[in-house]
């Protein structure tokens, strides 16, 4: 949570430095029933502890003054005015360009099938389908396959690092619907995540989703009729005027959910120089700038830069 807060604080300045689109649009977490007041208050208290600035608990009247298209079936909401949105593709490309300018070389389209470290030395050898590489540091940021990469190196997978592919299906709506909300609209979270959100994009569309489906197929990025119907149904709980006729495309992606229910970012005690950066699901994008700095410090413990 603290990584999220600090990463969010830095995003505006980073967008100017690296030239990607960022908007400070704020967010609302909706409470539909008065009986959920304690849960909303707990979310507010957690935000205060983690240093989220200017949080407010709003009445339904205050919410509707800000967002008139929000459901009337509302008991209140948590407002975070510091929240923002980015273009995730633009951010990723900007970071990659910056890395390239600083000497990073990209090697695409290769599957890692073996990693070994010298018994008496500090050098790793990494075999892929195309090449063999040598390195003093290996950073395991392999997403849904991070547990498999860890097992190649250590021979085991810690329980907290076991990865489940959690599919999220989204619908992208036409720009004619972009006016329906200004803020990013969440629902009170459950153990499966933040529920279905409704948010404007930096390009003026409306994005609705995601689902949270734990699946066995770590390549299962297909959409399903049931999943997309659920996106509209649950999204309409927040914004009743959502219409499937305004959907211009749908897609899905996989979050790398760790069984430890948290990011798994640490150096491996058994194999010095091997660093796991795993289980990075939401809010991983917001945390990315701070995660990068934290991992750089782990690298510096083993490498003189």
Annotate the PLM regions:
Residues 30, 112-115, 198-200, 265:
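A structural signal for short hydrophobic beta-strand segments in well-ordered beta-sheet cores
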Residues 2-5, 30-39, 78-97, 107, ...:
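Short beta-strand to alpha-helix junction loop
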Residues 24, 59, 108-110, 128, ...:
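Short loop/edge segments at beta-strand edges and connector loops
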């Amino acid at each position: 949570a603290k990584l999220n807060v600090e990463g969010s604080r830095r995003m505006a300045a980073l967008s100017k430095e690296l030239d990607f689109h960022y908007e400070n649009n704020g967010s609302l977490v909706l409470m539909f029933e008065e009986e959920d007041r304690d849960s909303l208050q707990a979310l507010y208290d957690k935000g205060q502890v983690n240093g989220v600035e200017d949080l407010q608990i709003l009445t339904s009247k205050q919410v509707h003054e800000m967002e008139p298209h929000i459901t009337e079936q509302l008991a209140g909401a948590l407002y975070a005015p510091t929240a923002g949105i980015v273009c995730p593709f633009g951010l990723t490309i900007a970071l990659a360009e910056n890395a390239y300018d600083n000497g990073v070389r990209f090697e695409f389209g290769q599957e890692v099938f073996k990693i070994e470290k010298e018994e008496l030395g500090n050098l790793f050898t990494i075999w892929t389908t195309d090449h063999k590489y040598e390195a003093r540091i290996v950073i395991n940021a392999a997403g849904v396959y991070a547990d498999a990469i860890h097992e190649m190196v250590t021979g085991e997978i810690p329980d907290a690092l076991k990865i489940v592919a959690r599919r999220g299906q989204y619908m992208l709506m036409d720009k004619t619907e972009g006016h329906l909300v200004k803020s990013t609209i969440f629902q009170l979270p459950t153990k499966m995540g933040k529920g279905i959100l409704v948010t404007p994009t930096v390009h003026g569309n409306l994005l609705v989703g995601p689902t949270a489906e734990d699946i066995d197929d770590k390549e299962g990025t297909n959409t399903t009729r049931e999943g997309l119907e659920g996106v509209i149904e649950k999204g309409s709980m927040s914004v009743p005027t959502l219409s499937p006729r305004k959907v211009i495309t749908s897609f899905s992606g996989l979050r790398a959910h760790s069984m430890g229910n948290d990011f798994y970012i640490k150096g491996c005690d058994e194999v010095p120089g091997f660093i796991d950066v795993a289980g990075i699901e939401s809010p991983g994008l917001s945390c990315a700038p701070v995660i990068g700095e934290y991992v750089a410090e782990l690298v510096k413990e083993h490498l003189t830069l």
